[in-house]
Amino acid sequence: MECDKCGRDAVMQAAYSGSHLCETHFCRSVEKRVRRRIRADTLLGPKATPENPETWVIGLSGGKDSVVLTHILDETFGQDRRIEMLALTIHEGIEGYRDESVDACIELAAELEMRHELVSYEEEFGVRMDDVVEENPENMAPCAYCGVFRRDLLEGYADKYDADKLLTGHNLDDEAQTALMNIFQGDVKQIAKHFDASIGDFEERAEQDDFIPRAKPLRDIPEKEVALYAQLMELPAHITECPHASEAYRGEIQELLWKLEENHPGTRHSIMSGYEELAELAADRYGGDSDSDDDSNVGGDSDGEGDSDGENSGDSDDENSDADLSECERCGSTTSGDICRKCQLLESIQAT
C-alpha cells in the first residue's frame, strides 16, 4: 500500500476518507487538522499581544491525547509571544498507575521547556482514589467521583493562574460519544451547554463570566490516529487503562460507534457535523440557561487512561449552570446550590 502523496509505504489507511499516507504525510495531516480546528474555533483571541498575552492551561495527564495535544500546541505556538502555556497534571492517587503517567508528563514538559504544575487529590482534598473506590459511600462508578474532583482542580488552578483558556485532549471518538449520549438522553439544554462550554467558535459562544472557557483542538482526530501519531513521533505517552475505569453507558455508546464506523466509515464525522449545527441552534435557544454540566467527558484519553479531567464524568451536578450561581458555603467555588458537589462527596467520604 503506497502513500497517496509520495508513493512511499503507507502507515495508515483512513476508510472514512479513502486516503493512504506514509509516516511523514500522516503526521502532517494530523497537525494540519488540529491547526485548522484552532483557527476555526478562533482559539487565539484577536486582542492577544506580546505585551498582553493569553494564558492557556493544558490538562496534561500523560495519556496519548493530552501528550499529543501538548506537543502540537508547542510546535505551533511555542515561540509565539502572544501566548503563555502551562501544563497542569493531576495525581489522583492510583497506585501502580498514575506515577508512570506523571513521569511522562514531567519528561514531556522538560523536553518542551514548558511550565509544569503538579497537584494531587491527597494534597488538595485529603483523599486518594484507591481509598475512595474501596469505600464508595455514594455507590457510584469511580469515574463519577474522579470527574468531580478533577474538574474542580482544573478549573480552580486555571483560575489561580489567570487562564484565558483551558485546553483538554478530547478526540473525535470522545466527542461523538458525548454527542450521542446527549441526544439519546434527550437533553437539549445539555447540548446547548456543550456548545457554549467547549465546542463552539469562541466568537459565537455565550458569555460565561464564572468559568474558564474550554477548547478541544483534537476533536477532529480519531482516537486511533492520535495513538498512531504518538507512537510515530515517539512521544512519552503512558498508554495504559486506568484500573478503576468503568463507565457502563459510555462503554455501550463506544461499542455502538465502533460498529457503525466499521460498517459505515465516516459516521463519527457525520455525527459531529450535524451535532455541532444542532448544538449551535440549541445554544441560541437555551444559552446561559442550562441546568447541567458541560458534556460528560473531560480531558480525552477515552481508553481509560484517567485523563477525564471532569468533563465526561457522567456526573451531572449543575455546577456549570449559569442560572442562580452562588459561592459554595464550604470552599467558595461557584455552584448552583449552597454546597458544591465536590464538598458533598468529600463529606460523604470522610463520614465513612
Give names to the regions the model predicted:
Residues 2-192, 232, 296, 302-308, ...:
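ATP-dependent adenylation/nucleotidyltransferase module used to activate substrates
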Residues 9, 91-93, 122-124, 197, ...:
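Short, solvent-exposed coil/turn elements at secondary-structure transition points
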Residues 16, 24, 28, 99, ...:
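Electropositive phosphate-/nucleotide-binding environments in soluble metabolic enzymes
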Residues 79, 259-263, 331:
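Histidine kinase transmitter module recognition
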Residues 149, 173-262, 270, 300-319:
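Catalytic subdomain that performs nucleotidyl-dependent activation
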Residues 261-268, 273-297, 309-312, 317-320:
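Glycine-rich phosphate/adenylate-binding loop
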Residues 277, 283-288, 294, 317-352:
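C-terminal, charge/polar-rich interaction regions
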